[in-house]
Amino acid sequence: MTNVPVADGVGATEAGVLAANTAAGTGASPLIGDDDRRTGRRRALAVLSLAFVVYLLMSIGLWWHVWSTHPTTVTTCGCGDPAFFLWFLAWPAHALSHGQNLFYSTLLFHPNGVNMLSNTSELLLGVPLAPVTLLFGPIATLNTASTLAPALSALAMFWLLRRWVRWTPAAFIGGLVYGFSPFMVTAVATDHLMLAFLALPPLIVGCVDELIVRQRRRPIAVGAALGVLVTAQYLVSTEVLAIMVLIGLVALLLLVGYAFLSDRQDLIRRLPHATRGLGAGAVVALVLLAYPLWFTFAGPAHLSGLVWPTLTPGTGGLTPSAIWHVHYSTADTRAFHVLGGYLGSPLPTSEYLGLGLLVVLGLGLLVWRRDRRLWLFGALGAITVVLSLGVDRTYWVPWRVLAHVPLIQNILPSRFMLVTTLCVAVMLAIIVDRARQSAGDVVRGAAGRWSARLGPALAGALGSLVGLGVAAVATVPLATGLIGKVPLTVQTVRLPLWFADAAPRLPPGQVVLTYPFIPSGIQAPMAWPAVDSLHFAIVGGGGPGGVV
């Protein structure tokens, strides 16, 4: 398999690949000893660990009012969606400790029960955090998950970008934009963990990159890892997985189309490796998901049709001007004030990217137009922005068609922005890396004429300054949108007096009808049994209301 030069946009030169493999502790070469590879792996692990510590400290800062007070009793609020997710994070610990089916419970929507896989139950987050729930309660679990989500998402993007850029700070900046974007902060502030935990998409992209572009590892092993990651994403958020699959198919079409037009022989050489790997991934995913898929579509209390029948399919799209001009989600915040007493300030809408970032991406694409990675992720980012518009437009948009496609019609258009954010993070990291390298080359060439000793050091320093300057132009507008909004506002989750004093003394198996009743949107009563270790069942519940 041939390697494409960096100037042409994908991969690296043979020397670059060897250097990257050595730095990352991967690859095999007769010129590199076992000690060198072990040293490289340790160095790569140290870099990843350091990046995670920084991201985690930033995430703790985001939730400072939680971790500096009482993380077992305070969170965003005990209202609306936070109350909803408190219950669903409490369920895995209860099911595992009582030997019950993780996928189904009659403790909610009693007596029919609730199908966890037809709901945004985030089982894969609740299961590993079950010890936290059992020891400290679901509020601590929610706070732990909400703190880890941005940090782990940023770390996963950092890992992915280290495959594509040479300068580690460029990868760190890309991870920062991905893990702490307005999309992420808004999702995590409202406890939408199925949207805030985005650590798996970069890992999935990395596997696909290995199978289709790099092709240095065994395809069956990489394909199996891809299948496991797809299964994991299904158990975190089926909506995010559906979006990833749709955009993945578009990306595959673009890659194959370009390869077919530019180098058919290379396409033919790569095809067997990619086919084996993707086939292995499909087999592993289907085997692991066979029972969950059956339970989702045919199990007890499953949903069919529109899961949000009160919403017109394709509505809930973004406002185009909010991409470059900061808007604040005052309507959502007002609903939290009315329904649950949320005290926080309005946050930037999830689609906000900032004018500086858009200018950097546009100029970077123009300057390094031979870099095919920029074209690929730029195209995917533009496509997902269009898909985020929704049907409520005076002009034609793709959702006029997608709104009539079964299953796809249940996706909220604005959530395609999660892929836009991924694409933006990748593009920014590549541009920052290329800017540093180009500036360094210019300085090195000029200084080298009169000082061979000073030239490389000066080139490295000035190149780094240029790279950091480009990053600042792109990210400062993003940060200013959050000024005065973080750390996020929190409050104590308070139970009504009866639920605090009398409910814990109820005999096991009792059913409680709460007031207010729990239609979707007034979900505060879901927090009451969650805090009480799901000691009793409740009638009704919040969440999707499709045909049962």
PLM segments and residue spans:
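Start-transfer (signal-anchor) and selected internal transmembrane alpha helices
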Residues: 1-65, 274-282, 457-468
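Membrane-embedded helix bundles of polyisoprenyl
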Residues: 55, 147-164, 169-260, 277-293, ...
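Membrane-interface coil-to-helix junctions
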Residues: 58-153, 179-188, 192-198, 202, ...
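Membrane-helix boundary/interfacial segments in multi-pass membrane proteins
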Residues: 75-78, 187-195, 312, 338-349, ...
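Periplasmic/ER-lumenal interhelical loops and adjacent helix-loop junctions
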Residues: 76-96, 274-277, 281-365, 413, ...
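Membrane-interface helix-loop-helix junctions at transmembrane boundaries of multi-pass membrane enzymes
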Residues: 261-278, 361-397, 445, 449, ...
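Signature aromatic-anchored transmembrane alpha helix within multi-pass, membrane-resident enzymes
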Residues: 279-283, 426, 432-479
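Extracytoplasmic
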Residues: 460-546
